[in-house]
């Protein structure tokens, strides 16, 4: 039951993040959306920051699990990179609330550690792309590091554009 409530809270937050008109998500609003009291919310999470951190952790786990799966695959580096990019964009499209989290738009200064985690997430994603691209470096027109930077920049740009278009 405790795990179920935690998941309900996380799903409620993800759903609330999809609403661009909701400028600030308070614990009172989150508790109401989750169908629990604010006190019950704090029994599951010590702070609002920890709720955001756990939601981000879900996103992080999903994307890096796919990246690690792709790294082990026997397909070409080009196909691995393409699949990582497509998976990332489809994940954000399917989980619209994560777009605001990954763009840091939904985070306030109180969630600075989550914002730092997002920065580290992009750095790790870029590192994985660089490692994949090094497998086929001789067939690239640019260095693997530059290609990885361009892909991550394109992802961040697409997420920003996606948010603006909502």
Question: What annotation goes with each model-predicted range?
Answer:
Residues 5-13, 30, 55-59, 63, ...:
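Generic hydrophobic, amphipathic alpha-helix propensity
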Residues 8, 16-50, 54:
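Helix-turn-helix
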Residues 12-16, 87, 91, 154:
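Short amphipathic alpha-helical elements of helix-turn-helix/winged-helix folds
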Residues 54, 68-94, 144, 148-151:
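Hydrophobic alpha-helical connector segments
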Residues 61-64, 68, 112-138, 145-149:
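Amphipathic alpha-helical packing segments from all-alpha helical-bundle domains
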Residues 90-127:
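Short secondary-structure transition hinges
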Residues 99-104, 119, 134-166:
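Hydrophobic/aromatic-rich alpha-helical bundle segments in the mid-to-C-terminal region
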